[in-house]
């Protein structure tokens, strides 16, 4: 395993892929804890479909993908919050409404213009190895911003996650914090789509948090454990992808599934002991 990892890091494109992927995995895991506890974990899936629609339009218009997708997905995140808070359409229904609409727009755009070319396929199924240097630099900068914002707002995110009503009563601007979480999630989804694809990006948000919750009981413990699990599973998944010539996104998800099963079994044994 060590020799395999050394061989991986001997290639510049693999180093770039691992650095970007590890940062995206870390961001997704940290945000995932709050989203899972707030029963909003499928927002990643919904926003990824919006991202696919935006990337399809960018490809058709010959626009740099991230420059169009980031603002569009952020706008979709705000729209999701507004629909969820101010209408009778709640939670998963709001996500399904926006995601299916955006996915349909993306599919129609692809059909009428470029067709299912390599870029569209990469955005749908993921291909972290196709990251350009410019995409990698932008992804690293955006990931650093997400991590910094999460650390700075950690106490408020904790308060809003567990008891939004009490958080409002103590002076926390809950709506603003929810908006920040939505924006950070949107940015993470967009930069993560290149690695995982629109079909699998939500797994980076859901699996590490659920796995950590099998063995940890405090919010801080779950956050730290989730972050470690996410990065470790990513590295192992990339190594498996490299060794067995598997799609990187699918390999990473399978490793996360194995980790979830192992932690669930460990929690069961601990409960019976």
Give residue ranges: language-model regions.
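Helix-loop-helix "hairpin" substructures at the membrane interface of multi-pass membrane proteins
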Residues: 135-208
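Short loop segments and helix-boundary regions at transmembrane helix junctions
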Residues: 33-116, 212-224, 241-244, 268-270
